[in-house]
A protein has these predicted regions:
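Gly/Pro-enriched, hydrophobic low-complexity segments
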Residues: 190-195, 212-314
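Structured extracytoplasmic
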Residues: 27-216, 220-231, 300-314
């Protein structure tokens, strides 16, 4: 009965949505941030400062990716690399199964098909995007000591150098956006979108919508269009849209765009992530990546990949 009443209350909150659309948003100032609230949010009585703090401190999105370290699952993998003419010049399609037990995991390739020069003659990756993808989702050899416990990023990159360090930094940037990433040249705190020094760079919006039939908060931030050249240089996360479960505040999905150019290190990336739940574990059900990036002496490459994860077991 309590669940029914709770559900009715949420539906009543959504009921006047047509009328709400005809009303203008209101602006709320908190922590130096200018946040636009839709009429439905105003009616809900949402504690805006508390909401922003929960968004800033959220760990459910990153936790979903960490949970892949301790779960068994099957993955459909689609990676495509594009040439300067915009055509696919190399690709990899595969089906893999990760086995995980007692803090150890290993990936078995069930099926794989490649085209073009996806691999070098010696079997190594010819593209950094392919190598990055493999480091995210594959473990060719058995790896032990795995955990889904969140830890300091400084510890996760400790002792890593070169491309291994860059891969770890990119993983943190992709899977924990908005938090400081140490060691990326000249980036500093530019990714810290909630830092007071970045408050005037973004438009923040809070809304209440449905995501695949579930009531949720929709939180979006987007770099302002009228920024000066030097202000634009302080932007790394261009746009981020996140759907939070209305009751649990767990992330249901996130879309984001990021770009950066420091000469030696540059990227322009869009990502879409759908989060699902297996028992007590959140996990990324679908991950879509489309972007180009490069590191000095490695050249520039554009790739697209999609990972679809299913058939989980603990």
């Amino acid at each position: 009965m309590n669940y029914f009443l709770s559900r009715v209350s949420i539906l009543l909150l959504f009921a006047p949505i047509v009328l709400a659309a005809q009303q203008s948003d209101s602006v709320f100032m908190t922590g130096g941030k200018q946040v636009s609230l839709t009429p439905v949010v105003i009616r809900s009585g949402t504690n805006v400062p508390g909401f922003i703090k929960r968004v800033e401190n959220d760990t459910t999105f990153y936790k979903a990716f960490k949970n892949l370290r301790v779960l068994k699952y099957t993955s459909l993998n689609d990676v495509r690399m594009f040439g300067k003419n915009g055509r696919v010049e190399a690709s990899m399609n595969s089906k893999t199964r990760q086995w995980a037990s007692h803090s150890c995991r290993v990936t078995n390739i069930l099926e794989e098909h490649t085209t073009g020069d996806y691999y070098k003659d010696d079997g190594e990756f010819n593209y950094y995007t392919g190598e990055l993808y493999a480091s995210l989702f594959f473990s060719k050899d058995t790896v032990c000591g795995e955990t889904n416990v969140l830890k300091d990023i400084k510890l996760s990159i400790q002792g890593k150098r070169g491309l291994d360090k860059h891969k770890e930094q990119l993983k943190m940037l992709f899977f924990n956006p908005g938090k400081d990433i140490p060691g990326i040249p000249l980036m500093g705190n530019k990714v810290m979108v909630f830092d007071p020094s970045h408050s005037d760079l973004y438009n923040f919006v809070i809304d209440i919508q449905e995501y695949k039939g579930r009531p949720c908060y929709l939180f979006s931030l987007k770099a302002k269009d009228d920024l000066s050249f030097f202000k634009k240089d302080d932007i790394v996360i261009d746009e981020m849209v996140t759907w939070f479960d209305y009751t649990t505040f767990e992330v249901l999905a996130r879309n984001y765009k990021m770009s950066y150019n420091a000469g030696v290190y540059r990227f322009n990336v869009s990502m879409e992530v759908e989060i699902a739940k297996f028992g007590k574990y959140l996990y990324p059900k679908v991950i879509r990546y489309d972007g180009n990036w490069g590191v000095m002496l490695k050249g520039k490459e554009r790739g697209l990949f999609t990972a679809t994860i299913y058939d989980l077991a603990d």
